Amino acid sequence: MTLLTRIKTETILLESDIKELIDILISPSIGTDIKYELLSSYSEREIQQQELTYIVRSLINTMYPHQPCYEGAMCVCGTGGDKSNSFNISTTVAFVVASAGVKVIKHGNKSITSNSGSTDLLNQMNIQTTTVDDTPNQLNEKDLVFIGATESYPIMKYMQPVRKMIGKPTILNLVGPLINPYHLTYQMVGVFDPTKLKLVAKTIKDLGRKRAIVLHGANGMDEATLSGDNLIYELTEDGEIKNYTLNATDYGLKHAPNSDFKGGSPEENLAISLNILNGKDQSSRRDVVLLNAGLSLYVAEKVDTIAEGIELATTLIDNGEALKKYHQMRGE
């Protein structure tokens, strides 16, 4: 039975099946048409949680058989694929969270389904991505590093043409936030598909995170939003996964539609992020950053409650610390 047949007919794939799939997808010598058929077929099936763990571990082990660890490190990112074309919320959040002293290792990529991915924005900001080897030095100095997925996982470049061809979210959107080169203590992940929240939360637990939040934003975003109830799966330090809804209005933030968070080109997104960090933008765009930064600070144990996290995020923008972090990352 071929791998394609097994993908189409088997309810649960073996770890060996998943390794075979990954080996094909990352091979430079196998044609795009074969990869397209396998990846599109796999993304249409009901993915089992253990399979996601197999995929993530297979990719990590291929590049980092002895995965490096930085105690207390955190990643804040979304899966992408929500088609919202929002500005780079999680990248903006990273400056705020790092300015609180959280060690943030943000693992990002160029855009697949939107106008401007994290790496596109960093290029516009004149902020260099960091190599995996140099990450500890920069974290010690600046509390923040941006690692480009194509640099940390050069094997991923062999998947990019296929992902572009498919033109919609695939299993790799779920995998992206989970393959940070570093073993993390904390993580916050936004997921485009609410049916995948539990699956991602359990996989994050398998990966050994101490605390995490996996969320799906109200009305379909992969960030917490201001437009209604956000779905939350929280991994606690005792290994429990609890789920609940969170509405920004319960924390003193005004209701706002997701359309308020529309971004544009890297140049336009730079202007949006900078105006939030320098305090000029007091609109709902600022509030959505405060909400996501507040959640991140809560996960990273900088505060005891989400409300305190939002309050701390507000202070870090208002007192200029978040903007200072931006300038520090630019080498100014």
Swiss-Prot record:
Record keywords: Amino-acid biosynthesis, Aromatic amino acid biosynthesis, Glycosyltransferase, Magnesium, Metal-binding, Transferase, Tryptophan biosynthesis
Cofactor: Mg(2+)
UniProt pathway: Amino-acid biosynthesis; L-tryptophan biosynthesis; L-tryptophan from chorismate: step 2/5
Catalytic activity, EC: 2.4.2.18
Chain positions recorded as Mg(2+) 2 binding sites: 222-223
Catalytic activity: N-(5-phospho-beta-D-ribosyl)anthranilate + diphosphate = 5-phospho-alpha-D-ribose 1-diphosphate + anthranilate
SUPFAM superfamilies documented for this protein: Nucleoside phosphorylase/phosphoribosyltransferase catalytic domain (SSF52418)
Gene Ontology molecular functions: anthranilate phosphoribosyltransferase activity; magnesium ion binding
Binding site for 5-phospho-alpha-D-ribose 1-diphosphate: 78, 81-82, 86, 88-91, 106-114, 118
One annotated Gene Ontology cellular component of this protein: cytosol
Positions contributing to anthranilate 1 binding: 78, 109
Cofactor: how bound: Binds 2 magnesium ions per monomer.
Binding positions for anthranilate 2 per the UniProt entry: 163
Principal EC category: transferase
Entry keyword annotation includes Magnesium: yes
Residues annotated for Mg(2+) 1 binding in this entry: 90, 223
Family annotation (PANTHER family): ANTHRANILATE PHOSPHORIBOSYLTRANSFERASE (PTHR43285:SF2)
Function of the molecule: Catalyzes the transfer of the phosphoribosyl group of 5-phosphorylribose-1-pyrophosphate (PRPP) to anthranilate to yield N-(5'-phosphoribosyl)-anthranilate (PRA).
Recorded family membership: Belongs to the anthranilate phosphoribosyltransferase family.
Subunit composition and interactions: Homodimer.
Protein name as catalogued: Anthranilate phosphoribosyltransferase
Organism of this sequence: Staphylococcus aureus (strain JH9)
Gene symbol of the encoding locus: trpD
